[in-house]
Amino acid sequence: MACLKLQAVTKSYDGVTPVIKQIDLDVTDGEFIVMVGPSGCGKSTLLRMVAGLERTTSGDIYIDNLRVTDMEPKDRGIAMVFQNYALYPHMSVFDNMAYGLKIRGFGKEQIRQRVDEAARILELEPLLKRKPRELSGGQRQRVAMGRAIVREPAVFLFDEPLSNLDAKLRVQMRLELQQLHRRLKTTSLYVTHDQVEAMTLAQRVIVMNKGVAEQIGTPSEVYQRPATLFVASFIGSPAMNLLAGTVSPDGRAFILADGMTLPLEVPRPQWADRRLTLGIRPEHIQQRVSQQKTSAQGVPMTLLTLELLGADNLAHGQWGGQSVIARLSHEEMPTAGSVLYLYLPPAALHFFDSESGLRMES
């Protein structure tokens, strides 16, 4: 096991435009970190730099306090699991897991001990003589993990390892990854575009956007207190409702573009006349039966459509020409065209500066 440190890591392919911008990260011994973000955000590039498959333009990478920035991948003490398994089709499961050890000069008995132990951990013992074509997708991915485990690396690197699996198998493999990490306690850096994977696997999440680490925090911190508008819009399904507007001169209302006002039970006079974006998650909006427009009874919204999800329902509408989604219980089934009265609890409101995108603190 080892710690991992990234110090002002930057990457540019043309020497002008950075695709990774000054990333600083400290991963403690045995920690499981997940990088999440949309396609093209730089998460896989950053992982490849840690692996040594990409060179940094500037900055340094340390593994267990050893500077590895210019080291070859084989000398860094890392093991990588890829999206496409990368198994040798003509080799058995045993030989696939053992191959890396063979070319590094390990003895037969040491190889057998390591492969047998990894197979036991991953429940692959009955499959050691099979070829990859005889395995399911989940079994192939476990073989790929086994090949990484036998190396006994200082750091595990995972590059979207579950992307090729169907939804049901992804759930199963997430659970297996959690159990594997609890057992091995190896420092791990994991890349995914799937926020469910990020939130369920990570001890800390790095939300990436355009080469920048927008926020680094626990899953709870990232979800409950997003640091930027991007994080608020990316994390959560459905995403946080984000409404652009201005705080009234007395700080007691939030005025939307068309003049519609949302009462603020907790006045914000310090932000008077300032252009902000108000955010609230769909599950925090509460439906009221009263038709009064006071904040305690709810603000009216005409229902455009209702999505029935089984466990709950999503009500879609608009305020001030801006989309709003409220998560209702499965028992609440209003019809399209009806008016809902929605209450916004003060403690559930988030405010962001509309220009910088940064979170506003009261």
Curated annotation (Swiss-Prot):
Known EC number? 7.6.2.10
The protein in question is named sn-glycerol-3-phosphate import ATP-binding protein UgpC
EC class, as a word, reads: translocase
Q: Name one Pfam family in it.
A: OB_MalK
Q: What is the lineage of its organism?
A: Bacteria, Pseudomonadati, Pseudomonadota, Gammaproteobacteria, Enterobacterales
Question: Gene name?
Answer: ugpC
Which processes are annotated in GO (biological process)? carbohydrate transport; glycerophosphodiester transmembrane transport
Quickly give the catalysed reaction: sn-glycerol 3-phosphate(out) + ATP + H2O = sn-glycerol 3-phosphate(in) + ADP + phosphate + H(+)
Q: Answer yes or no on keyword Magnesium.
A: no
Report the subcellular localization. Cell inner membrane
* Protein family membership: Belongs to the ABC transporter superfamily. sn-glycerol-3-phosphate importer (TC 3.A.1.1.3) family.
Q: Which residues bind ATP?
A: 37-44
UniProt entry keywords in alphabetical sequence: ATP-binding, Cell inner membrane, Cell membrane, Membrane, Nucleotide-binding, Sugar transport, Translocase, Transport
Q: How does it sit in the membrane?
A: Peripheral membrane protein
Subunit architecture: The complex is composed of two ATP-binding proteins (UgpC), two transmembrane proteins (UgpA and UgpE) and a solute-binding protein (UgpB).
Recorded GO cellular component terms are: ATP-binding cassette (ABC) transporter complex, substrate-binding subunit-containing
Asked if the keyword Nucleus belongs to this entry, the reply reads no
- InterPro entries in the record: AAA+_ATPase, ABC_transporter-like_ATP-bd, ABC_transporter-like_CS, ABC_transpr_MalK-like, ABC_transpr_MalK/UgpC-like, Mo/tungstate-bd_C_term_dom, NA-bd_OB-fold, OB_MalK-like
Q: Which Gene Ontology molecular function entries are recorded, alphabetically?
A: ABC-type glycerol-3-phosphate transporter activity; ATP binding; ATP hydrolysis activity
Species of origin? Yersinia enterocolitica serotype O:8 / biotype 1B (strain NCTC 13174 / 8081)
Which coarse location class describes where this protein primarily resides?
membrane
ABC transporter domain: residues covered: 4-235
- Function comment: Part of the ABC transporter complex UgpBAEC involved in sn-glycerol-3-phosphate (G3P) import. Responsible for energy coupling to the transport system.
